[in-house]
């Protein structure tokens, strides 16, 4: 866990499988009252989400936050785009990295830090199919080695 990182509410495990993560940035999220209650209850899905930069602002798109059960009329649209809180130089740096390079911004995890919801955004480049197979093969080999070492040390 990174320094100062709190309770993890949601993780995007598929992102690390589908992308090479080049750089990570922590950002705050602008949420309504009922949305933060749903996030605290870990009712958030990052699977299809991504971030984009429009007009000098960062936005989180396609992240599903389930409606709060007791929220009734105050519930917002679960799929709405949400503003990300980043410093201006961070936004310009990310915008420069994204220009024409085949890179994208993916949310990696959502967690609470000092009572505020934060999202860890990864600057990522898509993996090819053979890269994914290679990652799976390497993981299986490491698992087999650990299993054999455990069996060997048990004697």
UniProtKB/Swiss-Prot annotation:
Location of the region described as Disordered in the Swiss-Prot/TrEMBL record: 135-155
Compositional bias ranges of the Basic and acidic residues kind: 135-147
RNA-binding keyword on record: yes
Source organism, top-level taxon: Bacteria
Compartments (UniProt record): Cytoplasm
CDD domains for the chain: SmpB
PROSITE patterns: SSRP
Molecular function terms, GO-annotated: RNA binding
Keywords, comma-separated and alphabetical: Cytoplasm, RNA-binding
Gene Ontology CC terms, in alphabetical order: cytosol
BP GO terms, sorted: trans-translation
UniProt xrefs under InterPro entries: SmpB, SsrA-bd_prot, SsrA-bd_prot_CS
Similarity annotation: Belongs to the SmpB family.
Function: Required for rescue of stalled ribosomes mediated by trans-translation. Binds to transfer-messenger RNA (tmRNA), required for stable association of tmRNA with ribosomes. tmRNA and SmpB together mimic tRNA shape, replacing the anticodon stem-loop with SmpB. tmRNA is encoded by the ssrA gene; the 2 termini fold to resemble tRNA(Ala) and it encodes a 'tag peptide', a short internal open reading frame. During trans-translation Ala-aminoacylated tmRNA acts like a tRNA, entering the A-site of stalled ribosomes, displacing the stalled mRNA.
Protein name: SsrA-binding protein
Organism this protein belongs to: Streptococcus pyogenes serotype M1
